[in-house]
Amino acid sequence: MSRIGKLPISIPAGVTVSHKDEIVTVKGPKGELSQYVDPRITVVIEGGMIHLERKTDDRIERSLHGLYRSLINNMVQGVSAGFKRELELVGVGYRASNQGQLLELSLGFTHSIFMQLPKEVTVETKSERNKNPLIILESADKQLLGQVCMKIRSFRKPEPYKGKGVKFVGEQIRRKSGKSAGK
């Protein structure tokens, strides 16, 4: 039995879950999300709980069992509470601003980077004096939020010598000493 897959998912108040054909739809105060579920996995909704069951004990079905349980759990958490990620810009002259869903980044290149964010993701930028600028992203869809964060981070990944770049708040960057340390 999959240790993650066998755990039930509780449905909080204000969230409705429906299962039709092979699509699970979760509606809540933060929005609506849908997910395809492989026909080898059975979704049972009863008594305010969601249970996932698999037909056989094949290796692929064991992995799908845990996968779909995690995806549906993320959907339930997303539509009820939502997900939030914070990115920090470390570097001299690094700035971020937004006009609605258009994010403008100044990351030390000769040009500014403009990124149109999906409508499901809300963005807020903070720039305080003597602190690194922050980009705060919120969404009900955890997968989409992670993809957007990693896309922004890929514009200027933190480098190991000075630690400059776009990083998650609280992320530890593995630092290297320079050439002079070997002497």
UniProtKB/Swiss-Prot annotation:
One of its GO terms (biological process) is cytoplasmic translation. GO terms for cellular component: cytosolic large ribosomal subunit. Keywords: Ribonucleoprotein, Ribosomal protein, RNA-binding, rRNA-binding. The keyword Lyase does not apply. GO terms for molecular function: rRNA binding; structural constituent of ribosome. Pfam families: Ribosomal_L6 (PF00347). PROSITE patterns: RIBOSOMAL_L6_1 (PS00525). Belongs to the universal ribosomal protein uL6 family. HAMAP family: Ribosomal_uL6_B. Part of the 50S ribosomal subunit. This protein binds to the 23S rRNA, and is important in its secondary structure. It is located near the subunit interface in the base of the L7/L12 stalk, and near the tRNA binding site of the peptidyltransferase center. This is Large ribosomal subunit protein uL6. It comes from Porphyromonas gingivalis (strain ATCC BAA-308 / W83).
